[in-house]
Amino acid sequence: ASEIGLRVRKSDKYVMTLKRKKGYALQEINETISEEVFQQFLKDGIIPVEEIRNELEDVLKGQKVINYMSLSTFRIGFPYKKGTIAIDKCKYVDTVDYELEYEATSYEGGKREFVEIVREFGIVYKKSKPKIKRAYDALKKKI
């Protein structure tokens, strides 16, 4: 179950997302839900999206979901060369951290341009865990 993440992202709408590692692939299911459906989910712990609920049945075995953590990400992004630079400020479990991402159409080209960005601005590269994993690890240390 540690290879599963369920989140609800709120920006101009609410989007429930399941991310689950299956072999070498990452499965991702996204579904827009209303604020009312989200609030009901927080109250009753029943996943409102049937496809996600069915996908997690083998893990949950009828148990309800509880919200035990909040993770907020504030992102600024801008075009750079053939991609987009994104700078994230993440807040979770009494922690604030920052992350630099470079989104590109090709992996190799993006990797090359990312290395150029890091060198150009004197940034020390440090491979990071996914945000949700960092937040979960911080929560485990706290309890």
Locations of regions flagged by a protein language model:
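Phosphate-end processing signature that detects enzymes handling 5′-triphosphorylated RNA
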Residues: A1-I143
